Design a protein with these regions (language model features):
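Small-residue (G/A/S/T)-rich helix-start motifs and N-terminal tracts that mark the onset
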Residues: 1-74
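Conserved beta-alpha-beta core of the PfkB/ribokinase-like small-molecule kinase fold
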Residues: 74-77, 81-115
Length: 115
């Protein structure tokens, strides 16, 4: 049976970090990757030019959609952007009783930009 991991993080338009990197990593380990996007960044290998947070109701809806359909074996968090998103994600992790959790507190981009 294929293991399922849910990444809850930001989307990197350059593909080198965030949700995109997590999904590539899961695939390399033959783990099915699901995702909930917390924010979208305009970034590339040079830097980050813009960050936009997702509406909390949409973040929660993404997590619920995955939880209602897939048997999630592990959670990985990345850029959660603000305290409201952090609280909403924490509440849902508790609600679904997910215990296999990797927390990657992303606060600064690889290029040094504070997120």
């Amino acid at each position: 049976m294929t293991k399922i991991a849910l990444t809850i993080a930001g989307s990197d338009s350059g593909g080198g970090a965030g949700i995109q990197a997590d999904l590539k990593t899961f695939a390399m380990h033959r783990i099915h990757g699901a995702s909930a996007i917390t924010c979208v960044t305009a970034q590339n290998t040079v830097g980050v030019s813009q960050v936009a947070g997702m509406d909390i109701s949409l973040v929660k809806a993404q997590i619920k959609a995955v939880a209602d359909d897939l048997e999630v074996n592990a959670i990985k968090t990345g850029m959660l952007l603000n305290s409201e998103i952090i609280a909403a994600v924490a509440q849902q992790i508790e609600q679904y009783r997910w215990r296999q959790l990797v927390v990657d507190p992303v606060m600064v981009s690889r290029s040094g930009v504070q997120l």
